[in-house]
Amino acid sequence: DKRMVVLNLAPNNKVIGFQTRALSKYKSARYLTYDIERIYQDQNKELDVSEEELISLKKISTLFGILQVDFQRTVTMFEGPIDAMFMINSIGLATAGRSTEEFDEIPTIRYMFDNDKTGKEKMMQKLRRGKEIFMWGKFFDDTNLDLKYDKWLNNIDKNNRDKYPREINDLNDLIRVAYYLKDDCIKHLSKYFSNSKLDAYFL
């Protein structure tokens, strides 16, 4: 069972949490997340903190990059840690259903959730709260990257298509597809963030 490991590091490079992802898309447990409590338990060590401190530590340990980002600059929040690896000053959520409302109070936070029904619904909520979100629809309208990719993928031997994303659902997919097509559209992602409610159509 080969898995990729993404570490959540403190400024002193100590591991406070990590997530593993199965390299095979057919594994039932594709993502496994280890918060700081589980790390200590697996090593048979005691985490000497109060119950209140433990709650805070567990939350921080599953917010990937939270202790590394500079909140004086633009911070991009993603649904997953892997996406956050591809953009500087980013945070990745390790659990899809976690609330992020407390981050809406931070003026430098913007959101790039997944290009699917759930991700778009979450971003619509953020837009209503006046937060910057990524306009997937506008991005594809301008770049035609999704159409170019469909055409490129159809030219790939059917037996080899499983190696490639079926759709562009997140930043990880987007970067891979841009690489395959030798397209420089990823250099211009920042202009597709907006907090205007008039741009809801382009989500």
Regions found by a protein language model. Give the residues of each.
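TOPRIM fold recognition
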Residues: I16, F71-V75, P81-L203
